[in-house]
Amino acid sequence: MKQFREFIREGISTDTKELTELLVDTVYSHYIDDHDKNSIECVGWLDGTENAQLRFQKIYEAGIDEKDSVLDVGCGVAHLHTYLKNQGWNGKYLGIDPNKKAIDLVDENINAVHATVEDIGKNEKWDWAIANGVFNLGLKEEHSFWIIEHMISHANKGIIFNMLQAPYPDSNYVAYYPEQIKHKLSRFDHSKIEIVENYMPKDAEFTVYFYV
């Protein structure tokens, strides 16, 4: 007989999948339809190329080495892959995204599939699991941490993700206090947790380095 905790976890899993599908249908598919795949707007970044590059820089600065493997959760059209290649990185890459329209636009030489992090085999590991902009819209805290927990389970070195910083002026988005996130992450086995702030105009977001 299933334990109560198992029912709760199954409920969160189902809710996360349903919310993700809803976001794809109502939001992200329209960005793909309306913008060129080489633009950052096609994956929902509406604050300019300079800010998008800054996000990639902060992700890279977590310590991604030249041959490190990367699992890109919510990869969109794999812009992160392009950025890493431009830094001299040459590791194994898998991009996953629930938006099939986005995956269909990814260059054929880039390993990307229509999937979510729950679809990844339990024993599959990458040095880094990365989520760029995944937690900004439509997912409640419990759903975001469901994804984060799965990312940790697939990481050899660590996970990297960013979030909007509370208080955030637009209530349509989901924002968090950095110390709140650090506290919640501390329950997972780790060697270090680092919060990177003060890099974005108006301190609008922060990046988390979680080292396993």
Question: What are the functions of these language-model segments?
Answer:
Residues 68, 127, 157:
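Conserved acidic residues
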Residues 1-6:
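Short acidic, low-complexity intrinsically disordered linear motifs used
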